[in-house]
C-alpha cells in the first residue's frame, strides 16, 4: 500500500503518456522508466494526503546523486540525537552536496554519519567493524518502519571516477552492494521533508532551503549544472516554485521534483528514474 491514494484519472494520464512514447517510435522506452507522481488538494498538505499514480515505482535502481537527499535527512537526524557535532564545515558540505551535488562534500558527510573513512583495503576485524559502521544509515532508514524503504540500500559514497581500495571492496565483486532506491521510496522521503514529517519541522525547513531551485533563466545560464535544465524543472514557468534533487550519469538521468504554481496553489511532485 503506497503512502498516497491511487487516482484512476492520474493513472490514465500517465498510461497515455507512456503510450505516447510507443507512438513516437520508442516502444521499449517505457520499460526503462520508473515513475511516482503525486498531487495534493491543499496548498500546505500534510504527509499522506496525496493522490497519485505510478509506473515501476518499486523497482530498485542505482539512484546516482538522488541518494544525497537521504544523507541530508540523516545529518539532521544525527544532529538531533547529538551523534555528530554541529559545525560550519558540516553545513557547508550539506549545502554543496544538495545545491551543487558535490561528490567531495558527500564523501565528508558519509564519513561523519558512519565514522568511517576511505583508504586502502582492510581485513579481518577492522574490515568487519568498518562495514558494520557503513550500514548505520540503512539501519536508521529501517527504523522508520516505512514499507517503501524495505529494499533500499544507502551506504555508499558517490563518485566521479569510481571507488578504490576499501570502497571498491565494499561495492562487491559484481557491484551488488551499490546504492539502490526506488521512486516510491524516494517519493516518501521527499514528501516527508516537504511536509515537515521527518526528524522535526525546523530540520525539514532547513532541508527545504537546500532543495530550493531558481527558475530564473539568467541564473540557470550562469550554472550549466543547475539541476533544472535537462530535468523536470525545465518545463516549469519562471514564476513557479521548485524544490528538487537530480541525479545523472552516463547511463541514466533521475529527478525528484516538488513544485507549485504559486504559494497559494496545491503542490505536486514527480519522481522519475531512468535506466539503460
Predicted segments, located by residue:
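Short, well-structured active-site flanking segments
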Residues: 77-96, 106, 200-203
Amino acid at each position: 500500500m503506497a503512502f498516497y491514494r491511487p487516482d484512476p484519472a492520474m493513472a490514465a494520464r500517465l498510461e497515455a503518456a507512456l503510450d505516447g512514447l510507443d507512438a513516437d517510435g520508442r516502444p521499449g522506452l517505457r520499460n526503462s522508466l520508473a515513475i511516482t507522481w503525486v498531487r495534493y488538494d491543499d496548498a500546505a498538505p500534510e504527509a499522506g494526503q496525496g493522490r497519485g499514480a505510478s509506473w515501476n515505482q518499486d523497482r530498485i535502481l542505482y539512484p546516482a546523486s538522488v541518494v544525497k537527499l537521504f544523507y541530508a535527512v540523516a545529518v539532521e537526524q544525527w544532529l538531533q540525537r547529538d551523534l555528530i557535532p554541529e559545525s560550519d564545515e558540516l553545513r557547508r558540505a550539506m549545502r554543496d552536496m544538495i545545491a551543487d551535488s558535490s561528490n567531495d562534500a558527500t564523501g565528508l558527510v558519509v564519513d561523519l554519519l558512519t565514522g568511517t573513512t576511505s583508504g586502502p583495503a582492510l581485513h579481518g576485524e577492522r574490515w568487519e567493524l568498518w562495514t558494520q559502521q557503513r550500514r548505520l544509515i540503512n539501519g536508521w532508514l529501517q527504523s522508520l518502519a516505512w514499507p517503501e524503504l524495505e529494499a533500499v540500500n544507502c551506504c555508499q559514497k558517490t563518485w566521479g571516477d569510481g571507488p578504490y581500495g576499501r570502497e571498491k571492496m565494499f561495492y562487491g565483486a559484481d557491484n551488488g552492494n551499490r546504492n539502490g532506491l526506488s521512486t516510491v521510496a524516494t517519493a516518501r522521503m521527499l514528501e516527508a521533508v516537504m511536509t515537515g514529517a521527518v526528524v522535526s519541522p525546523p530540520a525539514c525547513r532547513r532541508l527545504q532551503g537546500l532543495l530550493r531551485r531558481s527558475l530564473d533563466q539568467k541564473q540557470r545560464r550562469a550554472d550549466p549544472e543547475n539541476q533544472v535544465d535537462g530535468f523536470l524543472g525545465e518545463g516549469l514557468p519562471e514564476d513557479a516554485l521548485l524544490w528538487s534533487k537530480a541525479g545523472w550519469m552516463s547511463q541514466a538521468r533521475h529527478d525528484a521534483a516538488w513544485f507549485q504554481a504559486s504559494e497559494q496553489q496545491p503542490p505536486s511532485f514527480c519522481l522519475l528514474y531512468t535506466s539503460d
